[in-house]
Regions:
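Repetitive beta-architecture junctions, highlighting loop-to-beta-strand starts
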Residues: 39, 54, 98, 145, ...
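Aromatic (tryptophan-biased) beta-strands that constitute blades/sheets of beta-rich domains
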Residues: 11-75, 109-118, 156-165
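Short loop/turn segments that connect beta-strands within beta-propeller blades
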Residues: 104-107, 151-154
Length: 200
């Protein structure tokens, strides 16, 4: 039976599954984001310079025909544009509708799942394009213009900051990035110019 942690708010729901156990992880540091281990993909496009290059060389032109399906996981219904992030054998997936999952990268077993339900009057129809890892946290920018920090081992909510009033048209589709310990997050919806202009 999945274990559910409501975190004192029914909008903040984390479910831990029996497919795997929360594990201790090395914290994601600035040095790791600049030069990650070969098997890690800790940020969008892997490194801060955005090259999107993996140094792994086991799969090449001679071995690509040997690839076989190892596991599969269903994604939430909607527009999937996310980059899976990988650190210390855990994969972090951002789904549409502000759902985040942590999986065992080797087996596909779901370790935990966080759902940030979107208010009925928020613009919750687009992709959740990426999330960010730093320290022991996973950062999610939500459709209702909040920034949520999750414990990377358990999925529990560490903190949440509301950045703007979603009823004025502000929202997030792009994800945050972390640089020098600072979480940087833009905002969408500024083209509506109801009360404010764009900001980061």
């Amino acid at each position: 039976t999945p274990e559910v942690n409501e975190s004192g708010d029914t909008r903040r729901r984390t479910t831990r599954f029996g497919g795997g156990q929360p594990r201790a992880r090395r914290p994601v540091t600035d040095a790791l984001l600049r030069d990650p281990p070969a098997a890690d993909w800790p940020s969008w496009r892997r490194t801060l310079d955005g090259h999107g290059y993996s140094p792994l060389d086991q799969i090449d032109r001679g071995t690509v025909t040997d690839l076989r399906l190892a596991w599969v996981v269903s994604m939430e219904e909607g527009n999937n544009q996310a980059t899976p992030l990988v650190h210390d054998g855990m994969m972090f997936l951002a789904h549409p509708q502000n759902v985040v999952q942590a999986l065992d990268a080797a087996t596909g077993d779901v370790l935990w799942e966080y759902r940030h339900p979107v208010p009925d009057d928020a613009a919750g129809f687009g992709a959740t394009r990426t999330i960010a890892l730093y320290g022991d946290k996973v950062f999610l920018a939500t459709y209702d213009a909040a920034l949520v920090a999750l414990d990377a081992s358990t999925g529990d909510v560490a903190w949440e900051t509301v950045k703007a009033d979603y009823t004025s048209g502000f929202m997030h589709f792009g994800g945050p990035v972390v640089a020098d310990g600072v979480v940087v997050s833009g905002i969408n919806g500024c083209g509506r110019y109801k009360e404010e202009t764009c900001f980061i």
